[in-house]
Amino acid sequence: MQAAQQSWELENTISLIDPQRDALYRYDEETHKALSAARPWAKDPHYFKSIRISAVALIKMTMHARSGGSLEVMGLMQGYILPETFVVTDAFRLPVEGTETRVNAQEEANEYMVSYLQSCRDAGRMENAVGWYHSHPGYGCWLSGIDVTTQDMQQLGGPFVAVVIDPERTISAGKVDIGAFRTFPKDYTPPKEGNEDEDYQTIPLSKAEDFGAYAHQYYSLEVSFFKSSLDTELLSQLWNKYWVATLSQSPLFTTRDYGSRQMMDLSQKVRRAARGIESSGSRGGATTPKDQQLEKIVRDGQRIVSEEVKGLLAAEVKMKLFQGIGEGTQTGAS
């Protein structure tokens, strides 16, 4: 059980904050007011470069995203800002109407948000809402056209960050698939990226157009996680509750629908690439030494294979560990 918890923390690089330096959990009102007055992000579209998320907030968001299944979910993150950094100390879900492709915050959600934040302040927790999160079940961490519009509106009121979690890829890979983003001002044209391969991720064919149309309107922040001595105790209690499910479940069965969709999407990409090669060959076009489209397809296939192999190895290890347990008791009873 403890090994499973430590493995999860190592996979997601969650660092322990020294109890004497738990300042990340203490809201610094003076620093927050000074930054809000100076508004350095208004002059530099890339001002915010990183986001630090507490382990408990990460678990809350991940479990919420997982509970939505194939439907998108949405919530808010509480915290504060430091120079060039968002600090997220907690998160809470919103009662919103979600579909498989979008999530819409209605009037009920807005009323709930205001009421919840006021209740937190009444209880002495002065952290502000610094961002919103939502899920992309099975199609990666990026901002769609609707997400970009939502983030643009939120940034008008001050510093705000958008976080996206893919619950299906999280279960399949064994590591939280998460991304944090901020949009650029309308009158700003970002410089072209030097190496797009570094930020490459698998995008389903049905989402490729939406992804490409808005990818230049936002940038990603570096995401890291932290925990305090209190978080260590809370995580221990959570693992006491869920360690049986961790051992009994297999990603091969939990995400088999997701795996099937990934293979189907890959086959469609291969067929499209083959048609493109045939048409270029019939026109007598010159062949390029490196076909970027085919290279991406190969990388997609390698990722699917690695996740399937990882699931098979995990199942094999569990079988070796638990095979034969209980047989001696049954033999003695007979």
Curated annotation (Swiss-Prot):
GO BP annotations, alphabetical order: protein deneddylation; proteolysis; regulation of cell cycle
What SUPFAM superfamilies does the entry give? JAB1/MPN domain
Keyword check for Electron transport: no
Q: Where in the cell is it found?
A: Cytoplasm; Nucleus
UniProt-listed PROSITE patterns? MPN
For the ligand (Zn(2+)), the binding residues are 134, 136, 147
Q: Where is this motif: JAMM motif?
A: 134-147
Question: Under the cellular component aspect of Gene Ontology, which terms does the record hold?
Answer: COP9 signalosome; cytoplasm
> Domain of life, per the record?
Eukaryota
- Does Protease show up as a keyword for this record? yes
Q: Name one GO molecular function term.
A: metal ion binding
InterPro entries (UniProt xref): CSN5_C, JAMM/MPN+_dom, JAMM_MPN+_peptidase_M67A, MPN
- One Pfam entry for this protein is JAB
Instruction: Please provide the record's free-text comment about the domains of this protein.
Output: The JAMM motif is essential for the protease activity of the CSN complex resulting in deneddylation of cullins. It constitutes the catalytic center of the complex.
Q: Which family does it belong to?
A: Belongs to the peptidase M67A family. CSN5 subfamily.
> Which named protein is this?
COP9 signalosome complex subunit 5
